[in-house]
Amino acid sequence: MLKIIFPSIMLLPLTWLSANKKIWTNVTSYSFLVSLLSLSLLWQNDENYLNFSVMFSSDPLSTPLIILTTWLLPLMMLASQNHMKKENMMHQKLYISMLISLQILLIMTFSATELILFYILFEATLIPTLIIITRWGNQTERLNAGIYFLFYTLIGSIPLLIALISIQNSMGTLNFLILSLTTHPLPSTWSNTILWLACMMAFMIKMPLYGVHLWLPKAHVEAPIAGSMILAAILLKLGGYGMMRVSIILDPLTKSLAYPFIILSLWGMIMTSSICLRQTDLKSLIAYSSVSHMALVITAIMIQTPWSFMGATMLMIAHGLTSSLLFCLANTNYERIHSRTMIMARGLQMIFPLMATWWLLASLANLALPPLINLMGELFIVMATFSWSNPSIILMATNIVITGIYSMYMIITTQRGKLTSHMNNLQPSHTRELTLMALHIIPLMLLTINPKLITGLTM
C-alpha cells in the first residue's frame, strides 16, 4: 500500500518545487504513473485481504475504489487547467495541493483496517473538499453550500464516533480482519437499535439517502469542476463502502431495521428522478441523478445478499466514472457559455459535433445501456430487490423509464434545437478536453470485458 501512498505524498513537493510553466504537466503525468502503480492491487486472490500492515490492507471491495481514486486525480488536473489559469501561481499550487491531499486521505480511508482510523480519515476528507468548494466555487452561494455540506456531514458523524467507541468497549477490537471472525450477534434491544442507527446514518447522509440529500445538489452545483468530479466519483462512494464494512458488525439487526430505509430509498429514487425532469440547471440535474443512482446502492446494501453486494459495488464504480464524465461535459459548456442553464446551450451539436458524440455516450452510460457495467450493476440490484419483494419491480421499472426520459431531455436540450443568437465566437473543443472524455469512457468500455475485477465482496 505504501507504494501508492508515498508517491502520492511526493506529489506535494513536486507541486511546490516545479517550474511555474511545467507545474500542470508534471503533476498530471506523475499522477498518471501513480494510477498505473495502483493497478498492481488487482493481482490478488478473490477472497483474501492483501495484508500490507496492521493498519492498511486491501481486498476486492476496496481495491476498485482505490484505483478509481488514483485514476481521478490526473483527470481532475486535465479538467481544471482552464478554470485555474486566471489565478496566480500561489493559488494554483494550493488548489493542486488540496486535490493531492484529498487523494492521499481517500486512499488511506479505503485501505484502513481499523474502524477508528477509518473514521478519522473519513472525517479528514471533509476539510480539503470544503476548502475546494468555498474557495474556488463560481458563485457566492458556494459559502451556503459549504455550510450545508459541513453541518450535514458533522451531524451524521458524531453519533458514529460514539457508536464505534461503544463497540470497541463491548468487543475489544475494531479491526475488520478480527471482527469478521468474531461471532457476536447483537440482540434486538432498544440500545442496539440506536447503535445501528448511529452507525448507518453517517454513511447514509454521505451517500446520500433521500431526505438527508439536500447538501448534495448545493455542493455539486457550487463546486469547481474538480470538486464536482471528486464528490460524485469518490466521496459519495465512501458512504456505500462504510455501510458494507459496518454491516459485518451489525449483522442480525440489519434484517429487521432495513425495511424503512429500503422503502425510503426506493421512494426517493423515483422522486429524485422525477425532480431531474424539471431541472433547468445542468449541474443540478446531474447531481439529482446521482442521488437517484445512490438510492439503488443503499437498497442493495440493505438487502445484504451476495448479488446485491456485487451490484452495489459495480454500480458505485460505474456511476463514479459516468457522473464524473457528465460533470466534465457540463463544465466544457460552462466555460464557453458562462451559464449552467440548459436552454442557453441549445444547438451545440452544430458547433461541436465531436463533443456531441461524448454527450451521447455519457447519456447512454447514465441510463445503463447494455453491455456497460452500469447495466450489469443495475440488473444485479433489480434482481436482488425483486427476490426480496416482488412489488418492488414496479418502482424499479418506473425509475428506469424516468432515467431514460431525463437522459434524453438532457441531451436534446443541450445538443439539439436552434442556436441562440449570443453564441457567435465560441472556442473549439481542445484536445485536452477530448482526451479527458476518452479517459472516462475507455475504462467503462474495458471493464465491460472483465467486470469480475469490480464485483467486490461476494460474501
From Swiss-Prot:
It comes from Rattus norvegicus. This is NADH-ubiquinone oxidoreductase chain 4. Its EC number is 7.1.1.2. InterPro entries: NADH4_N, NADH_Q_OxRdtase_chainM/4, NADH_UbQ_OxRdtase, ND/Mrp_TM. One of its GO terms (molecular function) is NADH dehydrogenase (ubiquinone) activity. The keyword Transport applies. GO terms for cellular component: mitochondrial inner membrane; respiratory chain complex I. It catalyses: a ubiquinone + NADH + 5 H(+)(in) = a ubiquinol + NAD(+) + 4 H(+)(out). Belongs to the complex I subunit 4 family. The keyword Disulfide bond does not apply. GO terms for biological process: aerobic respiration; cerebellum development; electron transport coupled proton transport; in utero embryonic development; mitochondrial electron transport, NADH to ubiquinone; mitochondrial respiratory chain complex I assembly; response to ethanol; response to hypoxia.
